[in-house]
């Protein structure tokens, strides 16, 4: 945690790498992440403040102190979230993804470690666009590794694919990952429990196995099963998902939708990183407009500039 213009901020320092090849790859990923962060704005996306390339690769964002969704869920076990709370969090995630997809951005690493809570632990924000890519009609993307347990099967199902080799996939990979996160929100259990990451990937890709959607309300079960369909083209988009979640929430009684009190951390609390590969940006709530589609910055700032007031 550092301070910039009298506000606490999160600073992500990216190691430049040890070899020329690694340095080129990491700088490219850094440039891509900063370009995307600076081009979109939404209340469920971490607020971008700035970045610099030299002397170190640094990304500065708002500071979220509510902790990761992963840490929050683990703290509740063996209890589960109330359905309206779980679906409310899912709605935050779906709206963030709707915004990214509207700007042609695929996240590719949607998982609880990359979802952070505001100080009151009532709102979820999406972070870490390190694996994100802009989608074009002609682009063929590399089979880079996200986190197998949450990744869409089409990202890794071609076993002959070598590192850096190209393959086709589209924004629907995020819809599959969203379904796995939604299942986890509803059950508060690790998806594919009892399997290693590679076993879970094999089961999903080659045996078409999914976590059980039994014992859920029919409407939620239908959302899950539609989102994790094997054929990406049969999965709904996030605009449709938002509407499905809103419809489900509208069917709940007023008593069911009363939000319970939640324990929350001090705004000055510094929480540890959750797992390798995540940005670990812990932040307070930004005052951003609630625009479902998101919007571009009115005056885009320069991407790479150092912060004389950061210390």
Predicted region positions:
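Activation segment signature within eukaryotic-like protein kinase domains
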Residues: 89-90
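Conserved N-lobe beta3->alphaC-helix segment of eukaryotic protein kinase catalytic domains
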Residues: 14-39
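A conserved loop-to-beta-strand element in the N-lobe of protein kinase catalytic cores
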Residues: 54-62, 70-71
